[in-house]
Amino acid sequence: MSSTQTRTDVILIGAGIMSATLGSLFKELVPEWNIKVFEKLDAAGEESSNEWNNAGTGHAALCELNYTTENADGTIDISKAVNVNEQFQISRQFWAHLVKQGLIENPGAFIRSIPHMSMVQGEKNVDFLKRRLEALTTNPLFEGMVLSDDPSQLQEWIPLIMDGRTSDEPIAATKIDSGTDVNFGALTRMLFDHLTSNGVELNYGHSVEDVKRLENGHWEVKVKDMSQNTIETHTAPFLFIGGGGGSLPLLQKTGIPESKQIGGFPVSGLFLVCKNREVIEQHHAKVYGKAKVGAPPMSVPHLDTRFIDGRKELLFGPFAGFTPKFLKTGSNLDLIRSVKPNNVITMLAAGAKEMPLTKYLIEQVLLSHDKRMDELREFIPNAKNEDWEIVVAGQRVQVIKDTPQGKGTLQFGTEVVSSEDGSVAALLGASPGASTAVHVMLKVLEQCFPQHLPEWEPKIKEMVPSYGLKLSEHPDLFKTIHESTAITLGLEEKDMVHN
């Protein structure tokens, strides 16, 4: 097995949406830097970013009830919802910039307008939804959201969900037309097409075997060319690990102090996919329900209109599965290999504390097709077993770490881990993930390149006009940006968004 050695400015591990976004930011800010990308698979965006491996929701907290929690006094805390929405607005602005500059074309291939709805049943839940609407609509980011508990109005909005519904239990839904369906696989491929045409070296079929820091502070990455069965050694002063579920083992190999006391717990997602075109055409929205009491946030059920390869699809889920793999294409030894002396206490503490999650996963794994269909019928009463089939989506590795709240705390979100000197950063976690990619990668730049920020800031503000500001505190700017990005991205948003 022969070996070669080369040096570059930036190494990106993984050809998913995160590396594609960071690479695109670098190309705009420092076009002269040399960038190399290493991807184990044969194409870009094939793991978590692939359109069949995630929900495709442009997460802006318009419909996801887990981002708005109820306080003890009955008030609704919308801070997390505002935060997620702000982050999605940053992504919209950057994507619109790339389209305007002609760096990516045909935005309709990766983003479409689709109403985002929250639907609940039962008196208590309807009351919660009404209070949630009141709280959200005090904020300009959620202007245009409306609620109805009138069955005839709901029949217009969501006929597939209302047809055959015999229960007299109260039901209500909120609706906002500025929601989006995002094909992150298509977007990832577009971004890498742009990058490779501008000198970025993208290496498929290259597996990163080891990572180590050199005496000069640079990073040495040992890469196996799987087609040639050769080992290559590449060095760079900056390394980004964006390998989805595969990021944690590579972060551990860096040996940086920040990688200690961090573990990962893999959860696979499954969706029911509709095979009946007549049924698919009856629904046009992303409708999110409320997680059952005691169920984790990842379990929020939703019925989604999707656009994949230009074709309308209908998916319901997620259902959870379990495999010890950290990637769909990973190894059954991934979980056990990730347990190290520095995180074993963290992992054991999480195991002891997260019994409800363990119980939930066991119940989910044991679900039959009939049982999954019963859950779907809570959304679509007339759903027929033969119209739906199960597909296995991507692996989500939930971060486990020690926090002020205690050891072994399970984190639901997306997290950047970087070294103190800013020479290496890794992206861990799950939802809202890809929707907030631009915000998260700007955070990487802030943490790892503080010395460059003063010179980069004018260009960043050109790409993301609201950079450094909270749009929720600048309603006029939000309205201007939201309308201009909608036009550039070809989003057909109704006038009610800003009435």
Swiss-Prot record:
The keyword Oxidoreductase applies. It comes from the Bacteria. Its EC number is 1.1.5.4. InterPro entries: FAD/NAD-bd_sf, MQO. It catalyses: (S)-malate + a quinone = a quinol + oxaloacetate. One of its GO terms (molecular function) is L-malate dehydrogenase (quinone) activity. The keyword Oxidoreductase applies. Pfam families: Mqo. Keywords: FAD, Flavoprotein, Oxidoreductase, Tricarboxylic acid cycle. Pathway: Carbohydrate metabolism; tricarboxylic acid cycle; oxaloacetate from (S)-malate (quinone route): step 1/1. GO terms for biological process: tricarboxylic acid cycle. Belongs to the MQO family. NCBIfam families: mal_quin_oxido (TIGR01320), PRK05257.1-1 (NF003603), PRK05257.1-3 (NF003604), PRK05257.1-4 (NF003605), PRK05257.2-1 (NF003606), PRK05257.2-4 (NF003608), PRK05257.3-1 (NF003610), PRK05257.3-2 (NF003611). This is Probable malate:quinone oxidoreductase.
